[in-house]
Amino acid sequence: GITVFVVGHINKDGNIAGPKVLEHMVDCVLYFEGDPNTSYRLLRAAKNRFGSTNEIGVFEMLDDGLAEVPNPSQMLLEGRPEGASGTCVACVMEGTRPVLAEVQALVTKTTFNVPRRAADGFDFNRAVLLMAVTEKRAGMKLNLLDAYINVIGGLRLDEPGADLPVVLAVASSYRDVPIADDLAAIGEVGLTGEIRAVSHLNQRLACLLYTSPSPRDPKT
């Protein structure tokens, strides 16, 4: 056979630049991402003609090369602080795989005329909506405070089941009351403040039985 190398260009956003001809030529487009300060790397599929693009692979760079991380949830919760306010564990679906991730929130007094909102690893507009629901339904005066949301480990939570962990993390930081270390939250939050069930609940619960969210009780 003949091996052909096709050279493309990646723009500043990390996407394939120019016309989509290069993406149309191939069956699969994979992104290998990770924080340069850690040894962990995430493998994501932006295009996959033979399967889901929601699946992720987690790898660790060792002395003898890359090795698969068999339990990504344990890796993503590694180093989680005990008894800290503003943190909650979420159980989300990455394709067909349930994964535990830590959601952190910081609510603090603003120094600006208009309070700041920021979200890393979570949709910004969804975060603003959930904060509005929290303020209206729970009576928290977030309109006078800065609020920041961060998902640890480089994951991006873009499913309804991550709503409740975000709301709980924000409320925990606002009240400065820690959430129980062994508690994980799953649920969609509506505009009236109700909590709705999400899909694949049995799989998520099985993941929680396999990997404890508590840093004091790491199951393997």
Show where each model-derived region lies.
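Phosphate-binding/switch region of NTP-binding enzymes
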Residues: 3-81
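Conserved small/polar residues in nucleotide/adenosyl-binding loops
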Residues: 210-215
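Conserved P-loop NTPase/AAA+ ATPase motor core
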Residues: 54-207
